[in-house]
Amino acid sequence: MSKIVDIKAREILDSRGNPTIEADVILESGASGSACAPSGASTGSREALELRDGDKSRYLGKGVTKAVGNVNSAIRELLVGMEVSDQKALDQAMLDADGTENKGNLGANAILAVSLAAAKAAAVDQGKPLYEYISDLQDDDNEYSLPVPMMNIINGGEHADNNVDIQEFMIQPVGAPTVAEAIRYGAEIFHALKGVLKKRGLNTAVGDEGGFAPNLPSNEAALEAIMEAIEIAGYKAGDDVTLALDCAASEFYKDGKYVLAGEDRSMNSEEFADYLAELCDRYPIISIEDGMDESDWDGWKILTEKLGKKVQLVGDDLFVTNTRILQRGIDEKVANSILIKFNQIGSLTETLDAIKMAKDAGYTAVISHRSGETADTTIADLAVATAAGQIKTGSLCRSDRVAKYNRLIRIEQELGRAAYHGRKEFKLLG
């Protein structure tokens, strides 16, 4: 047991060269923890507010000195003297002080950085790894589980400067025996894909999340390139490795139509659901994220009725890690999975609440990074602690992405036992 004696924050840079906030929580025992807030590019309209300065003379208006100031003044005054191990009380105190539904006063980035830094400090104080400390915060007895990585090896949409409409084309090494081997599968396929693209005379520059970002004639062309890379790397698509998509459909939903500009196609909700179903028939796709616009609930119902019994349908912009919105989805039988992003909701306690609600309803939970990341690896510990079973943390290059994979490898070695369950994490696969 140890009380907080100091909190400090600073403005640092994320993986896109934009400012973000880093916070330190220092305890009377001498233990401390530091954490950073990530930032998204394609964001849901109902996400908690990321407080930016808006001063165009600094960082093009994206500075976070207001959020830093809130940590160094209001939040510091609020939390100094409180017991660090009472995570719920710390988070609730910040939520009450903010007083808004979207954390618009103090800023979700300020609250989150402190919330995670406090958890890290408490873990150090108690001599526990972070995943063990987070696990202890939950009401149920989860067994640790190493998540199946969902590796984004072709980037499109808002994550790349190319003509590909679907935002993420991912591979999942479901046939690997360990997380270290899953990461090896992914790395080998990533390098094979580079060769495939080079052979076709395509660009092998990478996007925000480390995946390749070539101009391609269609979404199918991206899938075909990945299928070829899987084979060249010596793996079998559908058995060793499956595919996943993040459509980020809100980014190309215009006037009630899904407009694939790269393919010069425009579809209504039912037609787009049919399009996705056809892709699933042709390729071993077992997960689709944001297959409809966040406001197109009727479209989501169509998609869920069409694919929900055989494909994981993940709500990201749809649910924004918010239990109130997730409950509506559960009640209306929309989607069957939720993407979990710390900064969409803004505190560790609320994040754990969303994971629990999803699990209790039979929904899966996919722990996720953001496109604007740092070296912070907390999401790896969160995935293990909650036995979520799946993690999205980008491709197999860029140190901001690889840091999370390396953390998973270290955790697996620490646990010293098999905790990677591969395809068993996908109940729809049987």
UniProtKB/Swiss-Prot annotation:
Keyword field: Cytoplasm, Glycolysis, Lyase, Magnesium, Metal-binding, Secreted
Keyword Lyase in record: yes
NCBIfam families (UniProt xref): eno
Main location: cytoplasm
GO terms, molecular function: magnesium ion binding; phosphopyruvate hydratase activity
Family label: Belongs to the enolase family.
Protein name: Enolase
Entry's localization field: Cytoplasm; Secreted; Cell surface
GO BP: any one term: glycolytic process
UniProt xrefs under InterPro entries: Enolase, Enolase-like_C_sf, Enolase-like_N, Enolase_C, Enolase_CS, Enolase_N
Species in which this protein is naturally found: Alcanivorax borkumensis (strain ATCC 700651 / DSM 11573 / NCIMB 13689 / SK2)
Catalysed reactions, as listed in the record: (2R)-2-phosphoglycerate = phosphoenolpyruvate + H2O
Pfam families: Enolase_C, Enolase_N
Cofactor: Mg(2+)
Keyword hit for DNA repair: no
Cofactor binding note from Swiss-Prot or TrEMBL: Binds a second Mg(2+) ion via substrate during catalysis.
Binding site for (2R)-2-phosphoglycerate: Q167, K341, R370, S371, K392
Biological role stated in the UniProt entry: Catalyzes the reversible conversion of 2-phosphoglycerate (2-PG) into phosphoenolpyruvate (PEP). It is essential for the degradation of carbohydrates via glycolysis.
Lineage top rank: taxon: Bacteria
Subunit details: Component of the RNA degradosome, a multiprotein complex involved in RNA processing and mRNA degradation.
Pathway(s) where this gene product acts: Carbohydrate degradation; glycolysis; pyruvate from D-glyceraldehyde 3-phosphate: step 4/5
UniProt xrefs under SUPFAM superfamilies: Enolase C-terminal domain-like, Enolase N-terminal domain-like
EC number: 4.2.1.11
UniProt-annotated catalytic positions: E209 (proton donor), K341 (proton acceptor)
GO cellular component, one term: extracellular region
PANTHER family reported for this sequence: ENOLASE (PTHR11902:SF1)
Binding, Mg(2+): D246, E289, D316
